[in-house]
A protein has these predicted regions:
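Catalytic-site neighborhood detector that most strongly recognizes the C-terminal catalytic loop/helix
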Residues: 249-254, 351-382
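Conserved tyrosine-mediated DNA breakage-rejoining catalytic core shared by Y-recombinases
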Residues: 222, 232-267, 357
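Active-site/catalytic core of tyrosine-dependent DNA strand-transfer enzymes
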Residues: 263-320
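Active-site-proximal segment of tyrosine recombinases
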Residues: 229-230, 324, 334, 341-353
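Basic, Lys/Arg- and aromatic-enriched nucleic-acid-binding interface segment
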Residues: 196-226, 330
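C-terminal secondary-structure termini that scaffold catalytic or DNA-interacting sites
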Residues: 272-275, 279, 375-397
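Flexible interdomain linker/hinge and immediately adjacent N-terminus
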Residues: 53-73, 169-203, 247-254, 286-295, ...
Length: 397
């Protein structure tokens, strides 16, 4: 309408220095009223265009620290493709993590937008050809700017397309992709914080809300993923042979135990006591104030830390405002283990890895530090050797 309410609005988020697009409050309330007024009828949840995940009766593999409530298929404009994708995603809900399914949805919606623009006559994934897929691969490499690497994106898209083929008994769909379609895994060096940066961060973390501070300090001391720290349960501690052990139930991987110091155990006990005093008996140690049945949400923790960084003007070694990431603490933990000359299997166990596949990344961090710290000495030795070589008769450099 010409003078109606805007469906979106712009809001400057000073913490991240970005202008975000969001739905105005009045529109959110109107949508809630509309959904409430609509009759359920005989329509199954998996037939709707927006699925409310709590309406499915089977258990879902969700990440407790991420607040995913719905799966929205409206971004797929092709009606037949939308139906096909719904069928596959419903199957995936039975055994895949919600995070992986959301990644599939992002990849599929991106592909469907491309089809609508370049191949509007394609109305079903069963109509795809190898030529269309090759054109899409070229588009990703030359025009798409949404991410640096589309490897995982393409794997998610392939799962959806091939499972559509399996469901409709079209085995030829599996020939749409070949192994060389997928970009190689990007080579990168893990980021980490210097000891000075960690010191600055912790000095200010200690001034934050006490339970948030405990969560962040434990996160550093345990070397876990942030999802594993925030989902620590109140019964995670045990004592064997006069030593404390902690049970870590990894959201993304295996459950494992490791020994911890008395100091770390006391910090955990203090965190449990705080939660019990304020919220009673709970499942998780670090709980959401508005809903103690749920753990701290990652978005809340990230926002609070970014606020603290801006307020206290914490900067990195290059003078830039610190770019905070909780996983960097895990990198620092792994780096310290390599510097202690611990063998790879022990490092993998302490990090909760099932294999040695990722340990070499932490070794690279350690090697880089060694190179940086010894560069001045090595350059001085090189200069001495160069002077000696120059004095050799008949020797050319």
């Amino acid at each position: 309408m010409e003078k109606g309410y805007a469906l979106t609005s712009k809001k400057y988020r000073s913490v991240y220095e970005i202008v975000a697009t969001e739905t105005p409050g009045i529109i959110k309330h109107m949508k809630k009223i509309l959904r409430y007024s609509q009759k359920d009828g005989e329509c199954l949840e998996q037939e709707r265009d927006v699925w409310e995940l709590d309406k499915f009766e089977f258990p879902l593999r969700s990440n407790p620290i991420k607040n995913v409530k719905t799966i929205n298929f409206k971004g797929i404009s092709q009606i037949t493709i939308r139906k096909e994708v719904k069928t596959v995603i419903f199957m995936h809900l039975k055994y895949m993590a919600i995070g992986s399914i959301m990644a599939e949805m992002v990849a599929t919606k991106r592909f469907c937008r491309y089809l609508a623009l370049r191949y509007p006559k394609i109305i079903s994934l069963l109509d795809l050809t190898r030529d269309i897929m090759e054109s899409y691969l070229i588009y990703l490499q030359t025009e798409a700017k949404e991410r640096k690497n589309y490897r995982s994106d393409l794997y998610g898209l392939r799962r959806v397309i091939e499972d559509v083929g399996n469901h409709y008994d079209r085995q030829d769909i599996k020939n749409l992709f070949i192994s060389t379609d997928f970009p190689s895994t990007p080579r990168y060096l893990f980021k980490f914080y210097s000891d000075e940066t960690i010191k600055k961060l912790n000095e200010n973390i200690f001034q934050m809300d006490e339970q948030i501070a405990r969560a962040l300090i434990l996160h550093q001391l345990l070397g876990t993923r942030i999802s594993d720290t925030l989902t620590l349960k109140t019964d995670c501690l045990s004592i064997r042979e006069n030593r404390y052990f902690i049970r870590i139930e990894q959201v993304k991987s295996i459950t494992f135990e490791k020994a911890i110091s008395d100091e770390i155990a006391q910090l955990i006990i203090k965190s449990i006591d705080y939660t019990e005093e304020h919220y009673g008996k709970t499942k998780y140690i670090f709980v959401k104030k508005e809903d103690p049945l749920r753990p701290f949400q990652y978005s809340m923790l990230q926002h609070r830390v970014m606020q603290m960084i801006r307020k206290n003007d914490i900067r990195d070694e290059n003078g830039e405002l610190l770019n905070f990431g909780t996983h960097t603490f895990r990198h620092c933990y792994g780096k310290k283990l390599t510097e202690m000359h611990i063998d790879d299997w022990m490092i993998a166990r302490l990090l909760g890895h099932k294999t040695l596949q990722s340990v070499h990344h932490y070794r690279k961090i350690g090697n880089k530090i060694m190179a940086d710290e010894t560069r001045a000495v090595r350059e001085k030795i090189d200069m001495i050797l160069m002077d000696v070589v120059k004095e050799w008769d008949g020797y050319e450099i």
